[in-house]
Amino acid sequence: MSKVQVGKKVPDFRALLDNEETFKFSENKGKNLVIYFYPKDNTPGCTKEGEDFRDNYNVLKKLNTEVIGVSKDSAASHQKFIAKFNFPFNLISDEDEKVCNLFDVIKEKNMYGRKYMGIERSTFLIDANGKLVKEWRKVRVKGHVAVSYTHLTLPTICSV
């Protein structure tokens, strides 16, 4: 499967959700979708990012937008993460990295001199027709969610 590109339709994909149901991208047509990728459940930055999406969830819903998070954590880990922080949205368990590879977010990282492959914190805005309209890579957690939803007020999104 080819990688997503801004301005192009996102290919249909399926993935395992936290509730062990299957997320089907094709079933989300008709509403905007924010997909955010984060490295790991229950870590400080990832928790803060999830809390920011949670705290802005009602604003996003009013803009006809659904939120979904993605990491390589298991569905069981996601269930605990959601319960602990009261997230009103689902998380995709991408242990096989298929969704991560589709969105090209697996990158070489460096921690304390040790190189490894991991998720680069990234967010993607997909319009109601399934077209990728904006991507943010190497995201800084603070203030990122507000920047994400300001793009939803652009005429190209609101007129869809």
Model-inferred region functions:
Residues 14-32:
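A short beta-strand-turn-helix
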Residues 28-44:
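Short active-site neighborhood of thiol/selenol oxidoreductases, capturing the structured segment around
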Residues 68, 79-120:
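Short, internal strand/loop/helix patches
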Residues 120-152:
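Thiol-/selenol-based redox modules, centered on thioredoxin-like
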